[in-house]
Amino acid sequence: MTIVNLAAYHFVSIDATEQWRPLVTARCNELGLRGTILLAPEGINLFIAGPREATDAFIDYIRHDPLFEGKFATLQFKESLSDSQPFRRMLVRLKREIITMKKPAIKPELGRAPSVDARTLKAWLDRGHDDAGRPVVMLDTRNAFEVDVGTFDGALDYRIDKFSEFPEVIDANRADLEGRTVVSFCTGGIRCEKAAIHMKEIGIDNVYQLEGGILKYFEEVGGAHYHGDCFVFDYRTALNPQLQPTENVTCFACRAVVTPEAQQSPSYVPGKSCPACAQAASAA
């Protein structure tokens, strides 16, 4: 059976997250969906999967059910396909933020930073500059272990371990960004949206967010100017530029990404250990 994988987020003020949670959970279970939906006062962030009929019904529900008062009427979804269900269960969780930055003054619903679509970005990267002739720098806002799976050619990577570290590393490295057009990017768009707003607020000019993130870029233009795959937070581990699951796996013990090459190591025991585990043990 072909499984449809949906990802979406939307920044919008929500006051009724506690009331919505059991109702959304019940509807997802009724449809046979699995995945995670995060609800917070600042909006929604979701990754769910199921048969086409179920995902289509969910899209109609979240956009049109009177419960949501039209808050998600324009919610846009990114879609990929897999041969099996990548999630084990269905969770609807309440959070303070749908992506944790610890900058409560940043409210994307009050105004986004400018965005650049995939085709325009590819044209900029093909030329080596934007439409105004400024050099373009790609800024990866993801965690270091995600970047190691794949990223844009020449992207800035400050090796952060969690997104809440982003404001501090930008403050320390803003000279890297001056005089250039900065395009922040992430997996699906949510982190780079907050990142771009923060950079605009601290006075960095010519900042854009990649509309829809890496996955939308893959969907629109493939893997141009990108090397490797894109890490995803489910049992597929990574998707290639054709949005197909790769042979990368996640170590059950330490959660490291294990490449096909690393899977040949004697240290790799499925469900128990990987080369990263062995290296950490030897260094202890």
UniProtKB/Swiss-Prot annotation:
It catalyses: uridine(34) in tRNA + AH2 + O2 = 5-hydroxyuridine(34) in tRNA + A + H2O. One of its GO terms (molecular function) is oxidoreductase activity, acting on paired donors, with incorporation or reduction of molecular oxygen. It comes from the Bacteria. Residues 132-226 form the Rhodanese domain. One of its GO terms (biological process) is tRNA modification. SUPFAM superfamilies: Rhodanese/Cell cycle control phosphatase. Keywords: Oxidoreductase, tRNA processing. It is an enzyme of class 1 (oxidoreductase). SMART domains: RHOD (SM00450). It holds the Pfam family Rhodanese. InterPro entries: Rhodanese-like_dom (IPR001763), Rhodanese-like_dom_sf (IPR036873), TrhO (IPR020936), TRHO_N (IPR040503). Its EC number is 1.14.-.-. The active site is at residue 186. Catalyzes oxygen-dependent 5-hydroxyuridine (ho5U) modification at position 34 in tRNAs. Belongs to the TrhO family. PANTHER family: RHODANESE-LIKE DOMAIN-CONTAINING PROTEIN 7-RELATED (PTHR43268:SF3), THIOSULFATE SULFURTRANSFERASE/RHODANESE-LIKE DOMAIN-CONTAINING PROTEIN 2 (PTHR43268). This is tRNA uridine(34) hydroxylase. It comes from Burkholderia ambifaria (strain MC40-6).
